[in-house]
């Protein structure tokens, strides 16, 4: 498990309990097949006989406004943190980078930083953003990043070599691959 050695992850650790393992095994007994919607899970299941394959998350594009940037507007950078996954998602790298960006470009940017918001509030809070800081340590973007990309935002997230190969895109063309 990728995590900071000096920090507890009680939210994640519940998935390692005997009770959760028993529940997981029950679900797997009752399922017909496994479908992955994310490249991060694809390698885990790819050799299983009951694995249907990878089907990317669908998104309804007409539900999003593709807001146009106005001239001479400050660049708005949004960083939304789920506190329980702060280290696992690599948010400390973004926080460190934002300190430098704030010092060098405070007159040209606006930062919006939020923590542990419910989904609807989270999505609404980044509406004016130009740049979204999503996560590191990932091969594929998460659903929030996918929705942000659908709105024409620049997203820093997982978009590595396997992402580019799978979706037949050039590196950093639809999302910026973020690695520590």
Where does each model-flagged region fall?
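Short hydrophobic beta-strand element within catalytic cores of glycosyltransferases
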Residues: 154-158
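Conserved donor-binding/catalytic core segment of Leloir-type glycosyltransferases
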Residues: 63, 68-89, 95
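Aromatic "clamp/platform" in nucleotide-sugar-dependent glycosyltransferases that forms part
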Residues: 137
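Membrane-proximal helix-turn-helix segments that form the acceptor-binding/catalytic region
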Residues: 4-34
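A short alpha->beta transition loop at the rim of the catalytic pocket in nucleotide-sugar-dependent
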Residues: 130, 152
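Acidic anion/phosphate-binding donor-loop and adjacent secondary structure
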Residues: 43-74
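Short alpha-helical segment that forms part of, or immediately flanks, the ligand-binding pocket
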Residues: 123, 146-150, 164-165, 169
